[in-house]
Amino acid sequence: MTARTFVGLRSVRPRATPPRLIVLHWTGGTGGLARLFDVLRKTTGPRSPDGLSVHYAIASDGTTEQWAPDDLVCLHAGSVNDASLGVEVCSPGFSTGSAWAREKVLGVVREEYEDRIRGRRARMLSYTPAQTLAVTTLVERWCDAHGIPRRVPLEADGLLMRRQMSARELAAYSGVIGHYHCHETKC
């Protein structure tokens, strides 16, 4: 695992309380870690005038880089930044249905599956096997280090929640979530 830090950015700050959430993001593109690092630094908005930040990033081949220490708050998940640790996984997320894109552009075959997120049908691409191992390893380490429960949000029927959680649900929840669970514009 290598380290790269957001030197000089004000997009990280000391953490006042222990994290209780792990937020998984996908990049929505096929670029590598260097490109992602550059994009996050340059992405600004009303809540992130100095760029976005995450604690870790994972490449298609499973390479994992730490971009900020766990004891800092990163800007990656809106209202739950203070309560969370964030990881970006280099993955297109949604599928175009193109076998060429799945195999040639990404350099590895990704499984395509269909699911519902926020009430709409979506064709998704899975993580690579190396990413799955890297994400699992990182999440387990974080759960052990910070006492975060190894769980995901479930609906009353026991199935994975595929919608944004309410502010009340987020405040009461501890565990692993997707970015779409905590942000209205993420799918």
Role assignments for model-derived ranges:
Residues 2-149:
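Active-site-adjacent loop/helix surface patches within enzyme catalytic domains
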Residues 131, 152, 186:
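Solvent-exposed, flexible loop/coil residues
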Residues 162-187:
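Short, low-complexity, polybasic intrinsically disordered segments
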Residues 145-165:
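Surface-exposed patches in mature extracellular/periplasmic domains of secreted proteins
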